[in-house]
Design a protein with these regions (language model features):
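His/Met- and acidic-residue-enriched segments that coordinate or traffic transition-metal cofactors
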Residues: 2-18, 22-179
């Protein structure tokens, strides 16, 4: 007969694995992906930012205007910083971001890369400066108001004023290069 002290205790035997499972589930909950609309915003923001970085890299070599080169330099600095912030946010939320521009933006970059000097300047100012920033401002405004994840919403709110400033800078640059 088994003594009382040596009897197996089913509750203790199952408690450790059950506790481990509960902790694992709780930890996964801390890193749960944001709602699908917020993830879609993050993906679009990553792709748009990557397009602006790649286009601005092109501008450093192909632009003829000093204004375009200065604008592109500012875009590289600001969009790299925003991309790093977005990457940290995505990592914390367990979201895998795209690392390349969208297919449409890749086509625009290819067309832009075929240009030089004044023709490059006009196209860059129009497509990357004004049009892309109009789209980015709209995207970030919507996320600032509608994102359900508070961290995603805060990222959009924090980044929006910079994008609005870029849009104003782009309009000025576009008027300079269209003269």
């Amino acid at each position: 007969m088994i003594s009382e002290a040596r009897k197996p205790r089913p509750i203790k035997r199952h408690a450790a694995p059950a506790l481990a499972a509960m902790l694992l589930i709780a930890a996964q909950g801390l890193h749960a992906a944001p709602p699908s609309g917020d993830v879609e915003f993050m993906n679009k923001a990553a792709q748009a930012g990557q397009m602006e970085i790649e286009a601005s890299n092109l501008a450093q070599n192909k632009a003829g205007s000093g204004a375009v080169k200065r604008f592109a330099g500012q875009m590289l600095q600001d969009h790299r910083a925003a991309a790093a912030d977005l990457k940290r946010l995505a990592s914390a939320k367990g979201v895998q971001l795209p690392t390349t521009p969208s297919q449409d933006d890749k086509k625009k970059l290819e067309a832009l890369g075929a240009l030089n000097g004044a023709s490059f300047d006009k196209q860059y100012a129009s497509e990357v400066g004004v049009k892309a920033h109009n789209e980015a401002v709209a995207l970030f405004r919507k996320a600032s108001a509608e994102a359900r994840d508070t961290d995603v919403r805060e990222f959009a709110r924090k980044t929006l004023p910079t994008l609005e400033h870029h849009l104003e800078m782009a309009k000025t640059m576009a008027s300079e290069v269209s003269r």
